[in-house]
Amino acid sequence: MAEVSEEAVLAGVREELAQLKVPGAAEATMETEWRDLDIDSLELVELVTALEDRFDVKIADGELRSITGGGDAVRLTLSLANEPASA
């Protein structure tokens, strides 16, 4: 799989937030915090599930609490998507 870029993941976060009908989704940045967008825990789970599907990654349930905003979601997804494949 080709390396995934930060811009691609951030665009994916914005698109998935828009699918969830989150106001302000298009303006989400690396600095955006979920509380600024009034994202609740169910929406966060739906966002993470969508990112897992989109980028073919698995985000552990324990990591959900560490995802407090756009930057966290992008960095975690990026690191998982660009991990070397296990042989």
Predicted regions and their residues:
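Phosphopantetheine-dependent thiolation modules in NRPS/PKS and related acyl-activating systems
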Residues: 2-39, 43-49, 54-87
